[in-house]
């Protein structure tokens, strides 16, 4: 069992507060964040959450840190990055407002709501509100102990994450990819394939979240290739296949990741303009019960590729 894998048996023992802020991640993922904060992290290096949303994941992680006797609230810092507003260019929901809907005055920022929800942890919480390209420092080389990625919804944002955060990982750093069950984000999957020689997977994904620990220094040329997306379509497909060899289902058995990753391959081809190839990969997956139930719009998009 891996070091992170030792947390899996503890998931059923975690009881989070009933009033934990709204989150788009599952209760299982929130429990795992708590366990990481409680049992694994120290605060000696950076603890970073990219995509804090309404604060549920931040709250669970911060609660674990507060319950951790090793974590020093005077010196340790949890960094929370997000736009903290709804509207064009964001993936935020109005449920992130305390009232569950946008204010009557039409305001788009839920930053004040986030601060109020996280008030118990403000002494060690640093909030970075705005576009990640502006709120992160390209010259920051301080090591990162923990990186929670729930922001890489576009290639442009993922490049920023790769250039400014992945480069700060060291052996022992822990990374969570929250959107790993999203076939439309194949850069998460083939970049993980590129990192496989240097990381240790915690175990099966916790619902949609893949967790891993860096086990060896990641060479600069690998990080550069990941950041610059310097892979051919065939190379990307091979890298995803390498991940498929390591992952079957999520920890509950409910998400068939081999099929999810196969659909991610279809999106690699789709985004490259190889629409016939994309559908040749995706078409046979229509018989998969999980994908046909949860990804109907994906099949429709791939079936109607502009070149078909």
Residue ranges and their predicted role:
Residues 7, 41-306:
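S-adenosylmethionine/decaboxylated-SAM
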Residues 1-44, 56-59:
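Class I SAM-dependent methyltransferase Rossmann-like catalytic core
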């Amino acid at each position: 069992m891996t070091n992170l894998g030792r947390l899996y048996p503890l998931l059923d023992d975690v009881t989070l507060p009933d009033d934990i802020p709204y989150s788009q991640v599952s209760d299982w993922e929130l429990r795992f964040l708590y366990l990481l904060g409680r049992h694994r992290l120290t605060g000696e290096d950076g603890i970073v959450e990219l995509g804090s949303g309404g604060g549920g994941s931040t709250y669970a992680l911060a609660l674990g840190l507060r319950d951790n006797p090793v974590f020093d609230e005077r010196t340790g810092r949890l960094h929370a990055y997000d736009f903290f507003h709804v509207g064009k260019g964001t993936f935020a929901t109005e449920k992130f407002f305390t009232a569950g809907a946008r204010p009557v005055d039409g305001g788009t920022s839920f930053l004040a709501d986030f601060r109020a929800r996280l008030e118990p942890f403000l002494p060690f919480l640093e909030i970075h509100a705005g576009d990640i390209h502006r709120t992160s420092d390209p010259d920051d080389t301080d090591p990162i102990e923990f990186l929670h990625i729930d922001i890489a919804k576009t290639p442009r944002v993922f490049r920023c994450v790769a250039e400014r955060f992945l480069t700060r990982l060291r052996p022992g750093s822990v990374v969570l990819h929250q959107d790993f069950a999203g076939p439309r984000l194949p850069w998460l999957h083939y970049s993980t394939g590129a990192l496989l020689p240097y990381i240790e997977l915690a175990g099966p994904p916790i619902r949609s979240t893949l967790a891993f620990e860096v086990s060896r220094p990641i060479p600069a040329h690998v990080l550069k290739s990941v950041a610059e997306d310097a892979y051919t379509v065939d190379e990307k497909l091979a890298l995803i296949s390498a991940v498929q060899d390591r992952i079957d289902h999520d920890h509950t058995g409910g998400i068939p990741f081999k099929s999810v990753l196969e659909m991610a391959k279809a999106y690699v081809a789709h985004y490259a303009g190889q629409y016939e190839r994309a559908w040749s990969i995706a078409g046979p997956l229509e018989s998969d019960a999980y994908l046909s139930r949860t990804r109907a719009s994906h099949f429709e998009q791939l079936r109607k590729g502009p070149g078909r």
